[in-house]
Amino acid sequence: MNNNTESFELIECHLEKIIFDENSDYVVGLNIREEIYGLKLNSYDGTILTFVDSGCAENPHINIIHQILLQFKKSVGFELQRVIIEAKYGDVFYCRLHWSHEKQDIYNVCSLGDALILQALSECDMFVVDFVFKQLDKFDEDGFMSNFEDYT
């Protein structure tokens, strides 16, 4: 019998920073256990996340696809309860969306970028699995982050 259930402990986290460099790379800083950890995002997801995090998505003239998804889910009775960063393979993160409904809950797997955007829009809880947390690199402003600009 496998006795490593602590590897699947959920650790609460939240978005602390969005960093952009001149090479169109983004890094998000997640606050986990009072320390900041850096996770890379592609330029599209980073741009949309910045749009949401800056408040521009609160009253847009055109909704982004993530807003349309949340509106549709709400219209059929689902609410995003939490986002879980649950797996990491190489530099790819897999996240699980937990949607609640009065009759049943459903779960979807998505990319880190989509999960962060949906979490920022819905303001639901966000967690990282301990197994993934142990693979993350601390946000090092003196090291690999020296070429990035902070836009938060």
Report residues per predicted region.
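Divalent-cation
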Residues: 2-152
